[in-house]
Amino acid sequence: MVTVEEVRKAQRAEGPATILAIGTATPANCVDQSTYPDYYFRITNSDHMTDLKQKFQRMCDKSMITKRYMHLTEEILKENPSFCEYMAPSLDARQDIVVVEVPKLGKEAAQSAIKEWGQPKSKITHVIFCTTSGVDMPGADYQLTKLLGLRPSVKRLMMYQQGCFAGGTVLRVAKDLAENNKAARVLVVCSEITVVTFRGPNETHLDSLVGQALFGDGAAAIIVGSDPTPAEKPLFQLVSAAQTLAPDSCGAIDGHLREVGLTFHLLKDVPSIVSNNIEKCLSEAFNPLGISDWNSIFWIAHPGGPAILDQVEDKLGLKPEKLRATRHVLSEYGNMSSACVLFILDEMRKASSNDGLGTTGEGLEWGVLFGFGPGLTIETVVLHSVPA
């Protein structure tokens, strides 16, 4: 008779969860940040709000973003004038777009990751789909499974309405799935488009304007599995993962799905909340490894905005090059919510290879990935690089 312990042992992988491939995708429509204020106030029929437009121009100028990608073109916005008002009932029209476009953009990223992985898609055992856009049943996980032609027995997990910390969440969940299911190969997709959050300006809701200045569209996909085969090429090992709520941070970042779409609220002290709590998260994650020099590890931090990055850098005494990959992705794409940290992983491993550095993590062995978002929730993932 087989024991439960023997069954459990046979079910589990031996090695750590490992990222085996990364793919990204963006909509074709690219917007220039320097001219975006003129476009945004024109398309929302708000040019008469001259003072507010000047504030928005300053927000865009300080954002450190050069361009973003957006599904919403001028043509789509003209067809849906309710999107351009500040608080017009518009959820039905927004939903009609996102339930189609979120899985479609996710499919592009997934196909890129699967191509790099180089294995038949029939080997995918699990799917995790994460989006802050467009709740539906069956969900985007189902739509993606159909679009890619995955096996009907693939085990799916749909994560809606998580927000900007969720790039860390999906890695934490994928790690548990890969390590507890022998031969599991987990396809993780984060697909985010701003169709639900786009709205016209209002003088009483400046934090909404901050979102209009920062958010962009993008999808990222990774393949995660333990015990890589000789045909697979490991990129990063997922060593540990933790989630915590920052103390005294209730209401710091909120999103509410209403008839008018997804409304966004952000307190001014978010950068200080993050920077005041980040060292505790680092210490808890790296003390077991005997690491306390935060410049000795590579960094992947969700780029919520330049103020968060500046305060984290200052609080921890980080050298400017530590957040190079993070700032590069913010500059080239804006804040893509959950997808951002996966874009940064992709940027880091490519730059490390191009620069001839010894590992996928800028030549360093250990690294950290941070997600920050509603709650205020902080996700901390310890990464181990592999030889480049």
Curated annotation (Swiss-Prot):
Pathway: Secondary metabolite biosynthesis; flavonoid biosynthesis. InterPro entries: Chalcone/stilbene_synt_C, Chalcone/stilbene_synt_N, Chalcone/stilbene_synthase_AS, Polyketide_synthase_type-III, Thiolase-like. Keywords: Acyltransferase, Flavonoid biosynthesis, Transferase. PROSITE patterns: CHALCONE_SYNTH. The active site is at C164. Its EC number is 2.3.1.74. The keyword Acyltransferase applies. Signal peptide: none annotated. It is an enzyme of class 2 (transferase). It catalyses: (E)-4-coumaroyl-CoA + 3 malonyl-CoA + 3 H(+) = 2',4,4',6'-tetrahydroxychalcone + 3 CO2 + 4 CoA. The keyword Acyltransferase applies. GO terms for molecular function: naringenin-chalcone synthase activity. GO terms for biological process: flavonoid biosynthetic process; polyketide biosynthetic process. It comes from the Eukaryota. The primary product of this enzyme is 4,2',4',6'-tetrahydroxychalcone (also termed naringenin-chalcone or chalcone) which can under specific conditions spontaneously isomerize into naringenin. Belongs to the thiolase-like superfamily. Chalcone/stilbene synthases family. PANTHER family: CHALCONE SYNTHASE 1 (PTHR11877:SF80), HYDROXYMETHYLGLUTARYL-COA SYNTHASE (PTHR11877). This is Chalcone synthase D. It comes from Ipomoea nil.
